[in-house]
């Protein structure tokens, strides 16, 4: 592949004079480029929706969501995965991020790791990948060997696969069952795909993980009702969520949360249904943790 022919590696005619601009004009130029990102992502929404449904299916079948990438792409996957346990109360590892070169590559590049196709497969073997898992490969260029190797192994195992890249008709898009390719155009700084490409990938990951968790019963209305209240800020947020969902007073919300060990979902059900904590938990269990279903049935 001629790397210079990739959109993500080409020069941007709107930013040829970066080194001659005033500071304000410099940041304005970057901002102008960033406005293109959401529009590019919008064009991929049908594929993003398919990825959300695939992620939901994986979770409901007892599988995991696995992100894998190199460099910025890998770091973004690790970031999104690491936010899921505190936000949605899911176990660590249910959403997992793999980066070429291992955890050390989060802080310092591991030379050659992204060019090792077998390493992608080996990393998935090491986490005992199963056919129930969803594997999402991230590569701005769309041709990272580490990601291709991982996607090919996952495909052989029977996993549903997703590719997220910022070049059209990329190699990883051709390997994966679902291809999400927001074409954001040349970067403001030539080839620096941590910029628009990274932003586009983050927007897509936001939708995949959050959308899947909504459809997995971790959200009521637009409230993260399975959030873990692990610090003062989150304890306060838990109380506010109960108030917002029920219309109860803060005192009533605090009393309910005290009985549920600050577990928001049963506290809401207690107030709206008149159940005690044990009965609220039992009813939630009977409805697979879906608060709306527990309230309506």
UniProtKB/Swiss-Prot annotation:
It is an enzyme of class 4 (lyase). Residues 55-218 form the SIS domain. It catalyses: N-acetyl-D-muramate 6-phosphate + H2O = N-acetyl-D-glucosamine 6-phosphate + (R)-lactate. Induction: Induced by MurNAc 6-phosphate that releases the repressor MurR from the DNA. Repressed by MurR in the absence of MurNAc 6-phosphate. Pathway: Amino-sugar metabolism; 1,6-anhydro-N-acetylmuramate degradation; Amino-sugar metabolism; N-acetylmuramate degradation; Cell wall biogenesis; peptidoglycan recycling. The active site is at 83 (proton donor), 114. It comes from the Bacteria. GO terms for molecular function: carbohydrate derivative binding; carbon-oxygen lyase activity; ether hydrolase activity. HAMAP family: MurQ. Belongs to the GCKR-like family. MurNAc-6-P etherase subfamily. A lyase-type mechanism (elimination/hydration) is suggested for the cleavage of the lactyl ether bond of MurNAc 6-phosphate, with the formation of an alpha,beta-unsaturated aldehyde intermediate with (E)-stereochemistry, followed by the syn addition of water to give product. This is N-acetylmuramic acid 6-phosphate etherase.
């Amino acid at each position: 592949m001629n790397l210079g022919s990739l959109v993500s590696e080409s020069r941007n005619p709107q930013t040829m004079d970066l080194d001659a601009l005033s500071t304000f004009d410099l940041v304005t130029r970057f901002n102008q480029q960033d406005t293109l990102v959401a529009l590019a992502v919008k064009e991929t929404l049908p594929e993003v929706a398919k990825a959300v449904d695939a992620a939901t299916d994986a979770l409901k079948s007892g599988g995991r969501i696995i992100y894998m990438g190199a460099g910025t792409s890998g770091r973004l996957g690790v970031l999104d995965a690491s936010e899921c346990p505190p936000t949605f109360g899911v176990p660590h590892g249910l959403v997992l991020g793999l980066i070429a070169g291992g955890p050390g590559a989060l802080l310092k590049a591991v030379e050659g790791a992204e060019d090792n196709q077998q390493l992608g497969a080996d990393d998935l073997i090491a986490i005992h990948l199963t056919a129930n898992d969803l594997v999402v490969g991230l590569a701005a260029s769309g041709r990272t060997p580490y990601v291709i190797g991982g996607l090919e192994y996952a495909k052989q195992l029977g996993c549903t696969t997703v590719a997220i890249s910022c070049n059209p008709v990329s190699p990883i898009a051709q390997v994966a069952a679902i291809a999400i390719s927001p074409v954001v155009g040349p970067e403001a700084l030539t080839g620096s795909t941590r910029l628009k490409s990274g932003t586009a990938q983050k927007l897509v990951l936001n939708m995949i993980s959050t959308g899947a968790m909504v459809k997995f019963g971790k959200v009521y209305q637009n409230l993260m009702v399975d959030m873990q209240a692990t610090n003062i800020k989150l304890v306060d947020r838990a109380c506010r969520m109960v108030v917002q969902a029920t219309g109860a007073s803060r005192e009533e919300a605090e009393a309910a949360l005290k009985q549920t060990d600050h577990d928001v979902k049963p506290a809401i059900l207690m107030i709206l249904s008149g159940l005690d904590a044990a009965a609220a938990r039992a009813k939630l269990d009977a409805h697979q943790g879906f608060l709306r279903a527990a309230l309506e049935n």
